[in-house]
Amino acid sequence: KDAVLKAAEDGAQMVLCTGGMSVDPDDRTPGAIRELGAKIITYGAPVLPGAMFLLAYYSPGNGIPDVPVMGLPGCVMYAERTVFDLILPRVLAKDKIDDIEDYGQGGLCLGCEICVFPECGFGK
């Protein structure tokens, strides 16, 4: 929680959190993001790999724009394509994301032998 606060208040345009994103009682990342007072857009996404993705917006105040805070599930470390590949370009374009449920159509990466992402059905 403190690290996210510091990053946002120091001017970070985005904060990525990894680890502790499951539903186990000792997974604390989602709770820490909630404690910030961040507006949780989603904790869970209809996308595989990446179902335990969290997206929130934290408002530091003092005229500082809302900071997107993403909780990234472990799959982003090993899977070739994940929910992060779908969401990151939109966050970088400052698109306020509120339509996560739309990823349910085409939300399964088939792990093709030869990956042609983004020229495939993943995330469409």
Task: Enumerate the predicted regions with their spans.
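Short glycine/threonine-rich loop/turn motifs
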Residues: 1-123
